[in-house]
C-alpha cells in the first residue's frame, strides 16, 4: 500500500498532510504507463554566436521547451519526462520514460497551468537563472509570431526595446541570458531600460520587475542577499534595503546594474 499525495474529502481534492493524511491505498494489478515528451515548441537546440561549449550544461543548458527548475543537464526534456515518470510511480503507476514523440491528435487527459509570466521573470531575476532567461527569450519570439530561433528571438527583443524607446546603437543581443560573449549593452541602453521598468505610470506592464520584487534588493533578497556576501560590509551596508539591482556573473566577469 502507499499513501497518495492527494485525496478526495467531502467532494474536494485536498493534499495529504501529517495532521490529516490521506488514507493508504492498495494498488491493483501493475499497470505500465508510457511517458513520451513533445518538446517541439522550440527547434532543436543550437548555440548562438559567442556561446562557449564549456558553458553547457552547468552555466546554461541547451535550450529546450521543457525542463525542471534548477536542473542543469544536456537534455532537460528527458529530465522532465523522468521526473514525471517518477511522480506516476509514487501514485502506484509503473511510469516509464519512452523518449520523444509528437502529441499529434492524442487525447488530452489533463493539463496544468504553470507560473505566470511575471512569476517567471521574478524567479529569473532573483536567482539569476540563465535557463529561464533563455526560455523567455524564445517565448518572446513566439509571442511576436516568429519561430523560436536565436535570430528571431533577437529580432523580437529588438522590436520591443525600440517600441519602449531604448537606444540600440552599439548593442548586440545574441542570447537571452547574457552568457554569449557577443552580447553587448551600452550604459545608455541599460539605464533607459531601467527607467522604463521603474516608470509604473507609463509602463504598468513592466512595473512588477521593479516594484513587484523582481529585481533583487540589496542585502535582502536573491543574489544580493547578505548571505551571498553582498552589502554586508561597513562601506556597503548603507545601501541595504534601498538599492535594487541585477547581478551578472561568469567565470571571469562580474557585473552589477
Locate each region found by the language model.
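Intrinsically disordered, low-complexity segments enriched in polar/charged residues with Gly/Pro
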Residues: 52-53, 159, 245-246
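C-terminal soluble interaction/assembly domains
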Residues: 175-176, 181-257
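A small/polar active-site loop signature that marks catalytic segments
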Residues: 4-16, 26-30, 69-209
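A generic structural signal for short, non-catalytic loop/turn and secondary-structure boundary residues
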Residues: 28-30, 59-61, 166, 236, ...
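Periplasmic/cell-envelope proteins involved in peptidoglycan metabolism and beta-lactam response
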Residues: 1-70
Amino acid at each position: 500500500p502507499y499513501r497518495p499525495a492527494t485525496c478526495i474529502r467531502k467532494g474536494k481534492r485536498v493534499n495529504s498532510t501529517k495532521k490529516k493524511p490521506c488514507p493508504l491505498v492498495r494498488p491493483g494489478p501493475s499497470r505500465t504507463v508510457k511517458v513520451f515528451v513533445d518538446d517541439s515548441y522550440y527547434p532543436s537546440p543550437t548555440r548562438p554566436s559567442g556561446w562557449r561549449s564549456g558553458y553547457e550544461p552547468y552555466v546554461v543548458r541547451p535550450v529546450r521547451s521543457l525542463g525542471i527548475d534548477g536542473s542543469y543537464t544536456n537534455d532537460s526534456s528527458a529530465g522532465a519526462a523522468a521526473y514525471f515518470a517518477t511522480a506516476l510511480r509514487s501514485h502506484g503507476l509503473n511510469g516509464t520514460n519512452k523518449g520523444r514523440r509528437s502529441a499529434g491528435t492524442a487525447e488530452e487527459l489533463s493539463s496544468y497551468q504553470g507560473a505566470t509570466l511575471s512569476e517567471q521573470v521574478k524567479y529569473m531575476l532573483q536567482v539569476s537563472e540563465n535557463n529561464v532567461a533563455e526560455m523567455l527569450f524564445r517565448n518572446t519570439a513566439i509571442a511576436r509570431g516568429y519561430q523560436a530561433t536565436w535570430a528571431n528571438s533577437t529580432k523580437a527583443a529588438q522590436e520591443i526595446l525600440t517600441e519602449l524607446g531604448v537606444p540600440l546603437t552599439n548593442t548586440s543581443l545574441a542570447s537571452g541570458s547574457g552568457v554569449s560573449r557577443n552580447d553587448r549593452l551600452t550604459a545608455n541602453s541599460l539605464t533607459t531600460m531601467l527607467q522604463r521598468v521603474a516608470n509604473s505610470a507609463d509602463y504598468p506592464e513592466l512595473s512588477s520587475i521593479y516594484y513587484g520584487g523582481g529585481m533583487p534588493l540589496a542585502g535582502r533578497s536573491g543574489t544580493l542577499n547578505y548571505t551571498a556576501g553582498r552589502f554586508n560590509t561597513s562601506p556597503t551596508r548603507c545601501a541595504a534595503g534601498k538599492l535594487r539591482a541585477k547581478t551578472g556573473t561568469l567565470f571571469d566577469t562580474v557585473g552589477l546594474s
